[in-house]
Curated annotation (Swiss-Prot):
This is Large ribosomal subunit protein uL10. The keyword Ribosomal protein applies. GO terms for cellular component: ribonucleoprotein complex; ribosome. It comes from Burkholderia cenocepacia (strain ATCC BAA-245 / DSM 16553 / LMG 16656 / NCTC 13227 / J2315 / CF5610). CDD domains: Ribosomal_L10. The lineage of its organism: Bacteria, Pseudomonadati, Pseudomonadota, Betaproteobacteria, Burkholderiales. The gene is rplJ. InterPro entries: Ribosomal_uL10 (IPR001790), Ribosomal_uL10-like_sf (IPR043141), Ribosomal_uL10_bac (IPR022973), Ribosomal_uL10_bac_type (IPR047865). GO terms for biological process: translation.
Length: 165
């Protein structure tokens, strides 16, 4: 069913609001994907707080107009699904991970930090660990010397007690 003018304006406004908050936009061609698989992709995107939408390309072009993602308009051809996220790598990670298990989802392009990326760029962005993973690694590295020092003190205390006994 075609959208009337008010519906189109509402869609553009909704997508524009998401794009205004976004750090990353990923475009992927979804031709031939079963509805069940697309539903799984949407569920994964929701878990990662990625806005995922199948959208007419003309409406998407209007939504990115005047934003850092405007250069992506040249890539907006064919049946595309748009992944938009506030997290720098979440959209790329969700789409890339799903495309590994479903060869009918083909990453077409993406944009991060005002730069348009090709498929290889999106895959490289997806390979970066998430913020939480990086913070946990940093915390582990910071804790290692402290816990080692604590174990050394405990061993020294045990040794002194053994000598005293």
């Amino acid at each position: 069913m075609p959208l009337n003018r008010e519906d189109k304006q509402a869609v553009v406004a909704e997508v524009s609001a998401q794009v205004a908050k976004a750090q990353t936009v990923v475009l992927a061609e979804y031709r031939g994907i079963a509805v069940g698989d697309l539903t799984k992709l949407r569920a994964q995107a929701r878990e990662q707080k990625v806005y995922l939408r199948v959208l007419k390309n003309t409406l998407a072009r209007r939504a990115v107009e005047g934003t850092p993602f405007a250069p992506l308009a040249e890539q907006m051809t064919g049946p595309l699904i748009y992944g938009i996220s506030e997290d720098a790598i979440a959209a790329a990670k969700v789409v890339n991970d799903f495309s590994k298990s479903n060869d009918k989802l083909v990453i077409k392009a993406g944009s991060f930090d005002g730069k348009v990326m090709d498929k290889a760029g999106v895959q490289a962005l997806a390979s970066i660990p998430s913020r939480e993973e990086l913070l946990s690694k940093l915390l582990f590295v910071m804790q290692a010397p402290v816990s080692g020092f604590a174990r050394a003190l405990a061993a020294l205390a045990e040794k002194k007690q053994a000598e005293a006994a």
